[in-house]
């Protein structure tokens, strides 16, 4: 999760800033936007097959947590990019022209005015993108496998990144397959709580940033 978010978040936000603030409107921007919208709607199992072939076989990572993390990164990257773009478009153009009119550089305007103004929407978009794949299992079955042993030391943790590793949704599937219904329903309940928590966190952070910006 940390690997996925640490890659997808800065790349997605940076891509949205470039497309919205630097790139000239035209065919290139339309193609990129169409591509991101298409990727956002592709079934997760397709990402899983691509991740298995590219990260697992071509790059030689095999069935591992890294392969699964990189695959999930590709899944949420277009979502974060599009959500950030929409958040940036909600900022009035008068903010941009006013800052540039008093001599501020474009990057200074983006860093101090545009991003803080769009932050509620950006945070909401990121959390919703992450929430979409909390219950993901199809892509991970093809890339990360179904291992569930936790590392006991820090060195074992980094070694575990190159080994098979499952998620709660995969364990839910395996438990149902084995007839372990009590375990399966317990995992399902935890997943529901996590999804509800993400939704509440989204609303809380959006209101918090909006209040700080206005006050």
What residue spans do the PLM features occupy?
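Short, small-residue-biased leader/transition segments that mark boundaries at the very start
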Residues: 1-3
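Hydrophobic positions within alpha-helical transmembrane segments of bacterial inner-membrane proteins
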Residues: 5-22, 45, 49, 121-133, ...
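Cytoplasmic-entry segments and transmembrane alpha-helices of multi-pass inner-membrane transporters
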Residues: 11-51, 82-86
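Generic hydrophobic transmembrane alpha-helix motif, especially the helices
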Residues: 36-72
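C-terminal transmembrane helix and the adjacent membrane-cytosol boundary/short C-terminal tail
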Residues: 85, 89, 93, 127, ...
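Transmembrane alpha-helices
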Residues: 106-144
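Interhelical loop and adjacent transmembrane-helix boundary motif
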Residues: 140-192
